[in-house]
Regions:
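Conserved H-loop
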Residues: 46-49
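C-terminal regions of RecA-like/P-loop NTPase motor modules
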Residues: 1-6, 32-40, 52-168
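Short acidic catalytic loops
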Residues: 2-16
Length: 168
């Protein structure tokens, strides 16, 4: 059987564009997906596009989503992902994200600097909502993922501290 469903891309249905409250269709649809997940004991993953005007924002949070409050309300976990800008991997740039890996030494975790290959394809993942731990806004930490688009593989390689602000 199945234990995970990926719904790509979660958005307002065309038939709902005539309504003055398009956000209600997102709430309704998210609740239907939630019911299905609970009924069949499924992990339900739904991708949602970031609002276009948020392109260039470095530190992502739920405000990047249209209808953010309604969308976030129903979710158990919310992860936000974006492309990594070249400036974020350049140590001389004011946007450098300071990638690191955790290494255990004498029962203590220390941060070990990580040099990200600037020629690789990278994505940055922000934990916006979790019911079981800290989120990126609490810690200032996001995850650096190496992306292999040919095989749709994301590998968690390091953590980082993205800057707040925008790149245009």
């Amino acid at each position: 059987g199945y234990d995970t469903v990926l719904y790509d891309t979660f958005k307002i249905q065309e038939s709902d564009f005539s309504s003055s409250r398009q956000d209600l269709s997102l709430v309704r649809d998210s609740r239907e997906l939630d019911k299905l997940a609970k009924k069949y004991n499924l992990i339900m993953l739904a991708s949602v596009q970031l609002a276009e005007y948020m392109k260039g924002k470095l530190f992502l949070d739920a405000s990047c989503l249209s209808n953010a409050k309604q969308t976030k309300e129903i979710l158990e976990n919310l992860f936000l992902m974006r492309t990594v800008y070249a400036e974020e991997l350049d140590e001389k740039s004011k946007y450098y994200c300071h990638p690191f890996r955790l290494k255990k030494i004498n029962d203590k975790w220390i941060e070990e600097e990580y040099k990200a290959d600037p020629n690789a394809v990278w994505r940055m993942l922000f934990v916006e909502k979790t019911r079981n731990g800290n989120n990126s806004s609490d810690t200032g930490i996001a995850y650096l993922l190496k992306f292999s688009g040919d095989h749709s593989i994301f590998r968690e390689v390091a953590q980082c501290r993205p800057k707040h602000g925008e790149i245009r």
